[in-house]
Regions:
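Extracellular beta-sheet/turn segments enriched in Thr/Pro/Gly and aliphatic residues
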Residues: 135, 221-228, 309-339
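Structural motif
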Residues: 242-253, 258-261, 324
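N-terminal secretory signal peptides that target proteins for export/translocation
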Residues: 1-8
Length: 339
């Protein structure tokens, strides 16, 4: 039995359907960890004991049985467990009649009919210890008002359950959204995903697509940062610094490290008012840094604030950055100019 006499708060993260979502991304953003901030500081959300236990609701829906849902979730969790630089484990505790979003000290996956949330494919919520960031309970619901597929190659007009489960499992672990992806406007409104560089991109691929069943370097760096294996800190490095405009820091600017040897993109946002950032989990060696504004997305998909300073030009850092093994670079400053 988990301890319940703690300060608890609920956080909800939703995944949007590509066909009607109003969110878009740019091709160089990076993983963002879920966290809480108060007057003292901030904490990241994570499971402090493993395996993380979960149950699956026993209700079938059109086209998907509860057993098929369990199998899709199991495959999604296995994909995260297979990350060689992270240490995560999950334990299925059986089927339950309880539904997601019940405050019952049980993490439950299942379907809910939410036709009012016509943009939402799935949603993950948490109860957490707001002092430490420990995840106490996490529920995930898949919207049964949209059509789902569990076939190996996907089905036209139906969203791939395993792909969406993989995204929600990332939230379950404490990852927030990445904006590493490209979209284009749709004639009927919203945006269409052209390509995603992270499973944690907040807009799903179109129905019938199964490309979202694999992790990207951005996802791998994120989960390894939260749950590092024994050698992760020693075998990787980090880059740190500030993003400034006219001498002032820019909160929410995102800095991306590009590895020219592999083509991998990994990064993080400037998460302090001073514009300070740190990008962890980088392969040692030369990287190219680029800063871009979050000017083509709904801010609320990434941050709990109504606005950010996005009035600056995308900027490359003037020098190549050499990331050391098992350590960090000296702090650098990346000045940007207003548009």
């Amino acid at each position: 039995m988990r301890r319940c006499a703690r300060v608890r708060g609920r956080i909800v993260i939703s995944l949007l359907a590509s066909a009607i979502a109003a969110v878009s991304g740019t091709p160089a953003q990076a993983y963002l960890k879920l966290g809480l901030r108060d007057s003292v500081g901030s904490v990241s959300l994570r499971w402090t004991t493993q395996p993380a236990h979960y149950s699956v609701n026993d209700r079938d829906v059109s086209g998907v049985s509860s057993e098929q849902l369990r199998q899709a979730i199991e495959r999604a969790f296995r994909t995260w467990e297979d990350v060689p630089t992270a240490s995560v484990r999950f334990q299925f505790d059986g089927f339950t009649s309880a539904e997601p979003l019940e405050d019952d000290n049980t993490s439950t996956f299942g379907f809910l009919s939410r036709p009012d949330l016509d943009r939402v494919l799935a949603s993950t919520s948490f109860f957490v210890d707001t002092r430490t960031g420990e995840i106490l309970e996490s529920d995930v619901f898949f919207n049964s008002s949209v059509p789902w597929s569990v076939t190996q190659n996907g089905e036209p007009g139906r969203f791939d359950l395993e792909s969406i489960a993989l995204h929600e499992a990332g939230h379950f672990l404490g990852l927030s959204h990445s904006a590493l992806g490209e979209t284009e406007p749709r004639s009927g409104g919203g945006r269409r995903v052209l390509g995603a560089g992270a499973v944690m991109f907040p807009i799903a691929f179109a129905s019938g697509n199964v490309e979202g069943r694999r992790l990207f370097p951005d996802d791998i760096a994120g989960v390894s940062d939260i749950y590092p294996d024994a050698g992760f800190r020693q075998d990787t490095g980090s880059v740190q610094g500030r993003v400034t405009k006219d001498g002032d820091g820019i909160f929410g600017a995102h800095v991306v490290a590009y590895d020219p040897r592999t083509g991998d993109l990994v990064g993080n946002f400037a998460l302090e008012e001073t514009g300070e950032f740190i990008i962890a989990g980088l392969r040692p060696g030369t990287h190219i840094l680029r800063v871009e504004p979050l000017d083509d997305a709904e801010i609320e998909s990434f941050f709990d604030r109504p606005s950010l300073d996005v009035d600056f030009q995308p900027t490359f850092y003037e020098r190549l950055v050499v990331v050391p093994r098992g350590g960090g670079t000296p702090s650098i400053e990346i000045p940007v100019r207003a548009r």
